[in-house]
Curated annotation (Swiss-Prot):
Location relative to the cell: Secreted
Gene Ontology process terms (BP): chemotaxis; defense response to bacterium; defense response to fungus; killing of cells of another organism
Subcellular location, principal: secreted
Positions in coiled-coil regions: none
Family listed: Belongs to the MCD family. Crabrolin subfamily.
Protein keywords: Amidation, Antibiotic, Antimicrobial, Chemotaxis, Fungicide, G-protein coupled receptor impairing toxin, Mast cell degranulation, Secreted, Toxin
Protein name: Vespid chemotactic peptide M
Any GO molecular function: toxin activity
Other notes: The primary structure of this mature peptide is identical to that of Vespid chemotactic peptide 5h from Vespa magnifica (AC A0SPI1) and Vespid chemotactic peptide VT1 from Vespa tropica (AC P0DRA0).
Top-rank lineage group of the source organism: Eukaryota
Length: 13
């Protein structure tokens, strides 16, 4: 996954 996607996932969690 891209760093941006990972960052979004972390924000959701």
């Amino acid at each position: 996954f891209l760093p941006i996607i990972g960052k979004l996932l972390s924000g959701l969690l």
